[in-house]
Amino acid sequence: MQQNQTTPDPQRWRILSVLLTGIFMALIAVSIINVALPSIQTGLEARDADVQWVLSGYALSFGVVLVAAGRAGDLLGRGGLYILGMVIYTLAAIAAGFAPSIEMLNVARFVMGIGAGFFNPQGVGMIQQYFNGRERAIAFGYFGTVVGVAVAIGPPLGGLLIRLGGPDLGWRLTMLVNVPVGILTIILGLIFFPRPYLRRLRNADGKPIGLLRTIRALDPVGSLLLGLTVLMVMLPFMESRGSAWVWAMLPAAAVLLAVWLKWEKHMKSTPTAPMVDLDIFRLRHFRNGAIIATLWFFGTTSIWVLVAQYYQNALGHSALVSGLIGLPAAVLSSFSANWAGHHLDKGGRRIVISGIAISITGLLLTVGVIALHSKFGVSEYWMILTLCFVGASGGLVISPNQALSLRDVPLTYAGAAGAVLQTGQRIGTSVGLAVILAVTFAVKDAFNWEVGAAAGFLTISTAFFATLLVAVADDRGDTKAVNLSRIAEPPH
């Protein structure tokens, strides 16, 4: 299906560099925070539950605003929303770095999540907007390279800053390291993003519409319903050790989801376009890609948590050692993502299938290393090699899947569609961490750490096998023509 094609913007590679700089900063902040948590707890004399919200608050606010922010960028201007999100994020990072208490730190992290939720979907939407064909796949490949590099250097950088600053100042430096990068990104965005950064919506006659109609076009009811749904899905898994009542949120989330779907169908029958046109789920590659993304992130985030738990709690290594174990894998991920971007036009979904298969192989080999270490004393550092399979596979799955999933989505919904994929990733991550860690600790308590870690990795392998089945089905499925003339219309 042909999308809206425009003459390539001569600034598009500079625009991409701005987008990737901001995304690099956000990923550094995510990968660095786990190393900083013990210092935060010591420095602010915080309880375990309070420290958990340093992670959970950011993840929740990020996931809740993603789709609404993506749609706002589609309507009002992606460049302006990207800069706005970066300003919010940078100011919140300053507040986090100087937070006098754990409560203030959690508030700042919550606001950082909102800022990240604003600018992340704009990045995906702008890649869709300014790149086409093979160039788009290459741009997403660079996106994956940045992910790999950020994940690789985040934990060692965090360890270095904490060592330099000590337990009181070190964790603050891990927050403030975002600030100069954020300021640089804002300046570069103001220079390179096309103007106007934001635009007013216009009616069929080309006249600007008023504030109330603009608000109505943003579908505030749909935004609220979907935001509450995401919140009620993610929160129980983040607070799984808390009160039993939180699990009542899951059936409530199912009800809210049904209401949201009905509302979006209603919005499509009105002159106002819905926040998410549900017809995009009729696109096979998008629908299957969303499932692949959710299942993949169900498992992949937990891998490195399990590695850290196994190396520190079972083997007695330091946090720095456990962080360095994954460094070669992250570097390989950056290279494989770049390679995949340059070959996606020819390889297509088969690249994703290969990546998933390689990851399953790496996980099974990792289980083998654990067993050999337990039985025969084989060095645990062989896991560096087996995890390289996992790292390389990430570059073959994440960015290629994103590019393939969004390939047929009309440009008018590029930001919202990309945000739907990212929301699936966030939900997959929160549910996966809770489930896989619960399995790991339950088996560990019944047997020992080696058996528990192996059970965790095998659970992830099972999730990846389900991901593989979806990817194979998507590759073999027939492409059916879908009438998308309605959702391709510019909103007004």
Model-derived features: positions:
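Intrinsic disorder in cytosolic terminal tails and internal cytosolic loops
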Residues: 1-11, 198-212, 473-492
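12-transmembrane solute porter fold
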Residues: 12-28, 33-35, 271-479
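Hydrophobic/aromatic residues in alpha-helical transmembrane segments
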Residues: 33-36, 56, 69, 107, ...
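A residue-level signal for alpha-helical anchor/packing sites in multi-pass solute transporters
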Residues: 126, 130, 160, 192, ...
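Hydrophobic transmembrane-helix bundles of small-molecule transporters
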Residues: 164, 168-291, 299
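Transmembrane-helix bundle of Major Facilitator Superfamily
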Residues: 1-191, 367, 438-442
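Alpha-helical transmembrane segments of multi-pass secondary-active solute transporters
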Residues: 51-52, 81, 139, 173-177, ...
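Membrane-helix interface/capping residues of multi-pass secondary transporters
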Residues: 48, 78, 102, 133, ...
